[in-house]
């Protein structure tokens, strides 16, 4: 044995040997099949640079991209009874909750963040589709109400990012109760004279579209978002007719007056900051397009 065997060869083998590759190093564009480097995608707020496809993102990433300098504080999630119905399908609901909490690091599907956008203090309530499809249960409902109450307490506008498949079936009527409860919270914010902007992301469906997600002063949709009460497949099976192309897409809903604008995630922060400054009569509105001033004023009224 000599120094070549003991030192050089192992060094070469280590340099040329196979390295462990992180599973999420590359992300596939669902719209084109293109493979995109994860770091490039993250630096572009998880919008595919070539196609403009908006990937789903975690709630904490959403808050980081949205607030000034990525700085914000979160509200502690409210405590609610866990699995009061003792529900079980393929597995116990309480075990399913534990799995999602371990996987996501979240207590439930909603995160409330406090921070500023373009210097304006706001409350942001973000729904995370990665937690049981963003479904609305007692925990999520209580967190949404908490966000509205905090906005009223601090006299701040509230921006809500919706992403949900609807009510959480494992909680039955307790889940459905959150629809009127969150609706009341919206009305409390409006009675306080505070702006409420909703950003509809992909997907926003089910009971959330029958409550807080469609009660904003202004509704903004991300490009390509699916928005509706029932999914297109369910509707087609019910009416036994083929739906129009693009039905329930963000652009389709804007064309038919259901949302006010479709805005790229890359432009959301600046757009919302301009709108809120108009709605709260803050300085620095002179660069806002005239049609945005008119729409925002009409909505606020």
From Swiss-Prot:
Q: What InterPro entries would the database entry show? A: AcCoA_carboxyl_beta, Acetyl_CoA_COase_Trfase_b_su, ClpP/crotonase-like_dom_sf, COA_CT_N
Question: PROSITE patterns per the record?
Answer: COA_CT_NTER (PS50980)
Positions of the UniProt region annotated as Disordered: 282-301
EC number, UniProt record: 2.1.3.15
Highest taxon of source: Bacteria
- Cite the annotated pathway: Lipid metabolism; malonyl-CoA biosynthesis; malonyl-CoA from acetyl-CoA: step 1/1
The entry assigns this protein to a family as follows: Belongs to the AccD/PCCB family.
Its biological purpose:
Component of the acetyl coenzyme A carboxylase (ACC) complex. Biotin carboxylase (BC) catalyzes the carboxylation of biotin on its carrier protein (BCCP) and then the CO(2) group is transferred by the transcarboxylase to acetyl-CoA to form malonyl-CoA.
Name the UniProt record assigns to this protein = Acetyl-coenzyme A carboxylase carboxyl transferase subunit beta
Lineage, opening ranks: Bacteria, Pseudomonadati, Pseudomonadota, Alphaproteobacteria, Hyphomicrobiales
């Amino acid at each position: 044995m000599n120094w070549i065997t003991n030192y050089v060869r192992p060094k070469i083998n280590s340099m040329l040997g196979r390295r462990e590759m992180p599973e999420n190093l590359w992300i596939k564009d669902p719209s084109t099949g293109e493979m995109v480097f994860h770091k490039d995608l993250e630096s572009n707020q998880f919008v595919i640079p070539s196609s403009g496809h908006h990937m789903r993102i975690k709630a904490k990433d959403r808050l980081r991209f949205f607030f000034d300098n990525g700085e914000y504080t979160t509200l502690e999630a409210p405590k609610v009874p866990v699995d009061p119905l003792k529900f079980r399908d393929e597995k116990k609901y309480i075990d399913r909750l534990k799995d999602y909490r371990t996987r996501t690091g979240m207590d439930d599907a909603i995160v409330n963040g406090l921070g500023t956008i373009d210097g304006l203090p706001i409350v942001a309530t973000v729904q995370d589709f990665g937690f049981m499809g963003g479904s609305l249960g007692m925990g999520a409902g209580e967190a949404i109400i908490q966000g509205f109450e905090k906005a009223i307490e601090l006299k701040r506008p509230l921006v809500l990012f919706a992403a949900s498949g609807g009510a959480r079936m494992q909680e039955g009527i307790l889940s459905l109760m959150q629809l009127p409860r969150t609706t009341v919270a919206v009305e409390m914010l409006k009675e306080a004279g505070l702006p409420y902007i909703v950003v509809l992301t992909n997907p926003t469906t089910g009971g959330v579209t029958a409550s807080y997600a469609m009660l904003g002063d202004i509704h903004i949709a991300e490009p390509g978002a699916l928005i509706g009460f029932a999914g297109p497949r369910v509707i087609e099976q019910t009416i036994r007719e083929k739906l129009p192309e693009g039905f329930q897409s963000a652009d389709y809903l804007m064309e038919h007056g259901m949302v006010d604008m479709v805005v790229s995630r890359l432009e959301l922060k600046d757009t919302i900051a301009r709108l809120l400054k108009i709605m709260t009569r803050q300085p620095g509105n002179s660069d806002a397009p005239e049609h945005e001033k008119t729409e925002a004023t009409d909505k606020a009224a």
